[in-house]
Curated annotation (Swiss-Prot):
Gene symbol of the encoding locus: BBP
Cellular component, GO, one term: cytosol
UniProt GO MF annotations: mRNA binding; pre-mRNA branch point binding; zinc ion binding
Biased composition (Polar residues): 84-93
Function: Necessary for the splicing of pre-mRNA. Has a role in the recognition of the branch site (5'-UACUAAC-3'), the pyrimidine tract and the 3'-splice site at the 3'-end of introns.
Origin species: Eremothecium gossypii (strain ATCC 10895 / CBS 109.51 / FGSC 9923 / NRRL Y-1056) (Yeast)
ZnF locations on chain (CCHC-type): 272-289, 297-314
Protein name as it appears in the record: Branchpoint-bridging protein
InterPro entries: BBP-like (IPR045071), KH_1_KHDC4/BBP-like (IPR055256), KH_dom (IPR004087), KH_dom_type_1_sf (IPR036612), SF1-HH (IPR032570), SF1-HH_sf (IPR047086), Znf_CCHC (IPR001878), Znf_CCHC_sf (IPR036875)
Entry keywords, A to Z: Metal-binding, mRNA processing, mRNA splicing, Nucleus, Repeat, RNA-binding, Spliceosome, Zinc, Zinc-finger
Disulfide-linked positions: none
Amino acid sequence: MTRLVWFCMQVAYCLHGWDWDIMDRGRSSNSYDSLWGGKARDNPIVSQLPLQYRIRSALTQEQQTAYQVMYRIQEITIKLRTNDLNPPTSRYRSLSPPPVYDSQGKRTNTREHRYRKKLEEERHRLVEIALKMIPHFIAPDDYRRPSKFQDKYYIPINDYPEINFVGLLLGPRGNTLKQLQQQSGCKIVIRGRGSVKEGKAATDLPKGAMNMNEPLHCVISADTEEKIPLGINAVESIIIKAITSPEGQNDLKRGQLRELAVLNGTLREDNRPCPLCGEQGHKKWECSSNPSLSMTVICQRCNQPGHAARDCTSPLNEFGKRTSDGPEFRETKKLQQDAPPPSGPVGSHPSAPGSGSANSGVAPASLHPPGTMAPPGALPPPGSLAAPGTLPPPAALPAPAAPGTLPPPVALPAPATLPQAGVPPAPDASPAVKTAVPIEGPPAPPQTAPPLRQTAATASSAGSSQSAQEEPENARNGVEKAAPGPPAAVLPPPPPPPPPPPPPPSS
C-alpha cells in the first residue's frame, strides 16, 4: 500500500507539478494563507506583468536584487492604475487609528487610503534604489517623485513633565534649532500640544501649527529620504542629553544661557579684554594706561602725589612740619639726592647768590630757551625746585690758569644813546650813524678789576651774569634792548674855558 501511494505521488508530480491542492495531506481548505503564500494563477496582476515570476537560469546576487526591485515596482504600478487597493487578509491585524476628517467632513484615514499611501511610499523607496543600482533605469510614466520626505519624532513630555524640551530644542532666539537644521539638512518643526504659547492667534501661525489633537512631536522633512534619519538623530541627541544630565550639569543648557546673555548684553566674565588697552587680566579702572587726575596733584607738605595739602595725613615732626616715612617718600627722596647737579655756568642756579633771580623773582636764563625772556613774576617749574631740607650743589670752581698769563680785558657794552637836538653829526661819521645821548637810569655798579689769576671762562661767566642782570632792569623800566649795530660816534670833549683877563695895573 505504501508503494502504491508513493507511485501515485510520482505520477501526479510529473503531470501537474508539485501542487498542494492535490496533495493537501488531509489539511482543511479553509486555512489562511500566509503573506508570502498564494498561487500565481490566482493573482490577476501577474498575467499583466511583462516580467516572468519564475527564474529558470542562474543569476548573481546583484542581478537577483535588481530583478526583484523592478518586478515589485511594476506590480505596485499596476495596482495603483487598476485601483486594486484591497489590503491582504491576515489573521493578525493592527488596531485602526482614530478617524480623521477633512474640512468637508470626509474621512481621510480609511483602510483603503492608508493602503494606497503605504504602496506609494514603498514605490518611492524602490525607485530610489533602482536609480542607484540599475543603469539607464526609467521610472514608470505615472510616477511623480515627491518634493519632500517627512517623518515624525514624538517627544516624551508625559514621562518627563519637569523638563522644558521645547526650550532646549529652540535655544536662544531659535539658534539651536537653526544649527540642527543646518547640520542635518532637514527642516525641523515642533508641532502638537504644548508647541504654541497661550494667547497666540491662529492667523499668526503657519498652517498645521494649531493641530492640538496629537501629542508634542517634531516634524522632520527633507528633499531626500537619506536625510530624514540624520534629522531624527539630531533631535534625539538633545532629548537624551536633557533626560540623562543631572540638574545644573547640562552643558547644552549652560551654553544656551551664556549665548542669551551675550545677545542681551548682560554677560559678565573675568576674561574680557580691557576697553582701554585691549589686554586681559585687569579691569578698566585698574589699567595703567588710564591717565588719573589724582596722580597729578602733589601735596605741598609731604611732596606725595594723590592728595592735596588739606587732606594730608602725614604726622608732624618736632619742628611742626609734615613728614612722611612711607616707602614712596623715601624712594622719591633718594632719587632727588642721587640726581646729577645741573650743568651750566656759575650763577645760573636759582639759589646761587648774585644771579639776580632770587631778588627779581624771574626764572634763571638756563630754564628758558635761548632768545626768550621769562615774564615778570614767573616761577620755575616744579621739577626744578629742590626738595625741602636739601641744599643746592656747590658751584663748580674754574680751572687754574697757566702761570704768567693775564686774562683778556672785559668788554663793556656801549651805552644806549638817543639823538640830541641841535648837535650836528661829526664830519667823520657816516650819514647812517646817528648820535645818541645816554639814558638816565640807576647808577651802574662799580667795576672792579678782575684778579690776576682770573681765567677766560670766569670772565665770560661774569659777563653773562652782568648781561642777565641788566635784562630784567631794562624790562622793568620799559626800555627795549637795542639791536646790535655799528659803534656810535663819540663827541670830543668841549674845550676848556679861556682864562680870565688879568686885572688892570693899579696906579
